[in-house]
Amino acid sequence: SIFESGAILLYLAAKTGKFLPASTRGKYEVLQWLMFQMGGLGPMLGQNHHFRIYAPEKIDYAVNRYTNEAKRLYSVLDRQLKDNPYIAGKTYSIADMAIFPWTRNWKNQGITLDEYPHFKKWFEKIGDRPAVKRGCEVLTALRKPLHDDKAREQLFGSTQYQKRK
């Protein structure tokens, strides 16, 4: 079995022959943006979301640090999308697939989409794709609310280490 979303996307692209250009230049353009998501966007937006929404106590330093980093990352994407219809160029790719889910919760990340007009246009275009809509519907149907301590413990595991001792 394969784990890690980036590895899964690469496997599926190789298996289907879709969403990853055959040309060396095109392939590495997609790969660099996939790595941008895996090494920067995903971890930073995840931390931003955690400290803004789920942290048991609000820590101003953490909220400000990750909100500012989120804004920087959205600016990077906005600049890239100024001259490109998709993240890695002219065609929809696994880079778009990797980045879109992390940006769906932009409201909870302290982001105003109007500040990133090229990103906003891309975000709306990707969100309008029929397959993306179907995927989002599945997620909405399966997602469980985190209203109680048990649900939060399952997601964040804050006491798991203590239980192992």
Where are these regions (language model features)?
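GST superfamily/GST-like fold recognition
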Residues: 40, 45-49, 87-115, 120-128, ...
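Residue-level signal for nonpolar/aromatic packing positions in well-ordered secondary structure
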Residues: 8, 77, 96-97, 126-132
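Surface-exposed helix-capping loop/turn segments at secondary-structure junctions
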Residues: 18, 79-91, 131-135
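Acidic/histidine-enriched, glycine/proline-rich intrinsically disordered or flexible terminal extensions
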Residues: 139-165
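Active-site-flanking alpha-helical
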Residues: 13, 102-103, 136
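Short, mixed-charge aromatic SLiMs
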Residues: 33-37, 70, 120-133
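GST-like domain detector, emphasizing the conserved glutathione-binding G-site
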Residues: 1-74, 78, 153, 163-165
